[in-house]
A protein has these predicted regions:
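Extended, charge-rich alpha-helical scaffolding segments
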Residues: 1-73, 77
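Short terminal interaction segments
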Residues: 2-6, 68-116
Length: 116
């Protein structure tokens, strides 16, 4: 029984390494889409990330070796960078919308009639 588990681990590591490399490529594509403000590519990247997360979860963390652990850490770091970029972009958009439309809950005097 231990032999079958030993044989399964390299195949799992190979599949995991492949999935992690694909995830890194998707995260790099996501970063480019964020920089270009390309909503269509962001949606595609999100869909691809979700599928890869499912594939990686099916393999499980027990298949991690030094190589796959390093790939997983790289993917995590790229995802964190993308999260920060997304948050900055969202804050920028929110600030611009607020500047254009005013804060919610404040009296808008832009279109009020002039006082005589």
């Amino acid at each position: 029984m231990a032999e079958s588990m030993t044989r399964a681990a390299p195949a799992d590591n190979g599949a995991l390494a492949t999935s992690l490399r694909q995830m890194i490529a998707v995260l790099e594509r996501e970063r480019q889409a964020l920089a270009a403000l390309d909503a269509d590519d962001l949606i595609c990247a999100a869909r691809d990330k979700e599928g890869l997360c499912d594939a990686i979860a099916a393999i499980g963390a027990q298949a991690l070796d030094n190589q796959t652990r390093s790939l997983a850490e790289t993917a995590h770091q790229l995802n964190e960078v993308n999260r920060r970029v997304r948050n900055l972009l969202a804050a920028n958009v929110a600030a611009r919308l607020e500047a254009l439309g005013g804060q919610r809950g404040t009296n808008r005097v832009t279109y009020t009639p002039a006082r005589a």
